[in-house]
């Protein structure tokens, strides 16, 4: 699952 990264200007995601 990939979750949004708070504070990323382009709404990037990280797989957690």
UniProtKB/Swiss-Prot annotation:
Disulfide bonds join 2-16, 3-12, 8-15. One of its GO terms (molecular function) is toxin activity. Transmembrane segments: none annotated. GO terms for cellular component: extracellular region. Keywords: Disulfide bond, Secreted, Toxin. Expressed by the venom duct. It is found in: Secreted. The cysteine framework is III (CC-C-C-CC). Belongs to the conotoxin M superfamily. This is Conotoxin ar3f.
């Amino acid at each position: 699952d990939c979750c949004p990264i708070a504070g990323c200007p382009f709404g990037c995601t990280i797989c957690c």
